[in-house]
C-alpha cells in the first residue's frame, strides 16, 4: 500500500466550532461559557460582557532612521518598525458584582505561547487570567 500522507480531521486541538446568537466560537466549551455568562448578565450578577478583547502586552518596537535629501540636507527622521506588538486576545471580559474586571479564557490545552502571554498579562495588568 502506498503512503498517502496523513490527513487532519477537524481543528488543531479537536475543538468543534459552534455558532450561538450569530457569533462563531472556537469550541463548544467556549459557546457554553458564553451562554452561562449571558445568563449571569441578565441576572445582574455581572455587567459589561465583551468578547474577544485584545490586551497589548508589548508595544510595537521602532527604530529611528536618519534621512538626507539629494543636497545633503537633513530630512524628517523616519520610524522603521522592527517588531510588531504582542497581543493577548481574551475570550471574555466582564465586570463582577464587586466592580472588578474579570478576564476569562476557555482552555482545553495550554500551549507554551499561552503560558508566556498569561505571565506577561499578570505582570503588566496586575491581575490573573481566569481559566475555564
Question: Where are the predicted features?
Answer:
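Electrostatic, structured charged patches in enzyme active sites and in nucleic-acid/phosphate-binding
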Residues: 1-132
Amino acid at each position: 500500500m502506498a503512503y498517502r500522507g496523513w490527513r487532519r480531521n477537524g481543528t488543531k486541538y479537536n475543538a468543534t466550532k459552534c455558532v450561538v446568537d450569530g457569533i462563531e466560537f472556537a469550541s463548544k466549551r467556549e459557546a457554553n461559557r458564553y451562554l452561562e455568562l449571558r445568563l449571569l448578565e441578565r441576572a445582574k450578577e455581572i455587567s459589561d460582557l465583551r468578547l474577544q478583547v485584545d490586551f497589548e502586552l508589548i508595544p510595537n518596537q521602532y527604530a529611528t532612521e536618519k534621512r538626507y535629501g539629494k543636497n545633503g540636507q537633513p530630512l524628517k527622521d523616519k520610524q522603521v518598525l522592527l517588531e510588531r506588538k504582542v497581543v493577548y486576545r481574551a475570550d471574555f471580559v466582564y465586570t463582577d458584582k464587586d466592580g472588578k474586571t474579570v478576564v476569562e479564557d476557555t482552555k482545553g490545552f495550554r500551549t507554551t505561547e499561552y503560558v508566556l502571554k498569561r505571565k506577561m498579562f499578570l505582570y503588566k495588568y496586575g491581575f490573573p487570567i481566569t481559566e475555564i
